[in-house]
Amino acid sequence: MLIKLDSLKNNYLFLLIFIIFCIRIIGLYFSPLEVQGDEAQYWYWSTYFDWGYYSKPPLVAWIIGFFTSIFGNSIFILKLPSLLAHFLTSFVLFNLSKAFKRNTEESLWLSITYLLFFAVSLSSNIISTDPFLLLFWSSSLLFFKICLNKKSIKNIILTSIFVALGFYAKYAMIYFFLSSIVLILFTDDKKELIKNILIIFFIVLILISPHLYWVYSTNWVTFIHTGDNFNWNASLYNFEQLINFIVSQFFISTPIILFIFIKQFAKTKKFIQSYSFEIAYSLPILVLITAQSFISRANANWSSVAFIGVTMIAVNVLYKNYKKIFLLNTTLGLAVLILVSTFIINPPNISPFNKLQGMKDATKEIQFLDESLNSDYIVFDDRMNIAKFLYYLPSKNEKLKYLSYGDHPGNHFEMLMPITIDDIINKKIIIIHRYDLPSNFLKENLLVKQMYEMPNSKNNFYISYFE
C-alpha cells in the first residue's frame, strides 16, 4: 500500500513538471515580445561557424545555428533552446540527487524546485549562455559524483566532456576546478581525488584547445573583454554594489531556498560532514563573486552555478524537516511562473517588457528611408542597435556598418564590420545613433536629424542623414 501511495505521489510530481513545461511553451509561443540586443547578437554569430566570438565562447551560437537551420529564424525557435536546456537540467538534477542515494520523491522535488527558480522562469524566455552553462555544470557534477562513488575511466571521460562543453558555453565553468580544489580539503583519499582532477583538467584542455587557439589568433580579444567585465579600473570598494548583489541572490532561486542554505551554517561541523560535496561546489563561488561585487561590481547571474549546490542542500533539509515551508516555496515559485508567463503573453507597458517591442516598426522606417535616399551605408554606434537591425533587416545586412575610431574594437561588430570617418566622406549615409551625434564631423555635415521614438524612452535612437 505504501509503495502504491508513493508511486501515485511521484506521478503527480511528474504531472507538475509536465504542466510547468506546457505553461512555459505556451507563454513563449504566444509572446509578442521581440528579440533584444544580446539575443540578436547571438543569432548573428550563429549565421557562420567559428570557434569563438568577440565576447563569448561559441556554444550558444552553435546551438542557435542548429535549431534555426532546421526550423527557421522565428523568435520562438531562437529562444526555445534555453527553455529546453532548463528542462534537461532538471532531468540531470534528478539523477544527481539519486547519485546521493536520495529517494525518487525528493529527487523529483529537486527538479521541480529548480524549474521554479525565479531566474529560470525569466531565463526560459531569453536565449543566453546561462541555461547551457547550468546544464553542463549539473552534468559535470553528476558524472563526477558517480566517479567518486565508483571509480571508472568512463565517468572521468564523461565528466571531462561535460566540463569542456561548459567552457564552450561560458568561462564561469572554471569554477568547477576551483570548487574541486576545495573538495580536496573535505576528502580522506586526497591523492586519488587530485589524480582524477588532474586527468579531467588535461582532457578538458585538449577538448577546448580549438577555442584557445581561436582566442590566441584574435589577440586574446575574448579574454580581454572578460577581464574588462571585472571593472577593476573603475572606482573600487562599493558597499552599494555589495548590497545590491547580496539582495539579488535571494531572487535567483527563491528567498526561502537561500535562507535555508544560510541557516545551516549554525550547525557548522555537522553541516560540512553531511554536505561537503554540495558546499564545495557552491560556497566558494558565492564568496568569490560577493567579494568581486564589493571590489567593483558583479551581475546577479555570475554566481548562478553555485545555486545547484545551494538548492541540493536546501531541498534535502526542507524535504526532511520542513514540509509546509517546502510547499510554500513551491507555491511561491508557481506564482512567479504564472505571473511571468502572463506578462510574456500580455506584456505591460513597463520595463523591461516595453524595451522588447517596436523593432518591427523601426525596421520598416529605416527600410523606407534607405530606399528613398538610396544610401551607401547604414551606420551604427551601438552594438545592441546594429544587432537588432541585422536580425530584423536581413535584406540590408551588407550596408550595415559599425562606426569605428581605429582603437581596440569595443565589440564584435566593430571587429567584423567597421567603418571609419574617412570611409564615409562623400557618401550618402544614414546614421542610427544611441545618444547625441557621435562625432564633430557628423555635426558639421548633418542634413537631417530626428529621434525615432520607441515604446520605451530608454530604447529611443536618433536617425541622422548626410551626404
Region spans (language model):
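Membrane-interface alpha helices of multi-pass inner-membrane proteins
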Residues: 48, 143, 148, 154-171, ...
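Transmembrane-helix motifs of polytopic, lipid-linked glycan transferases
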Residues: 80-101, 116, 139-143
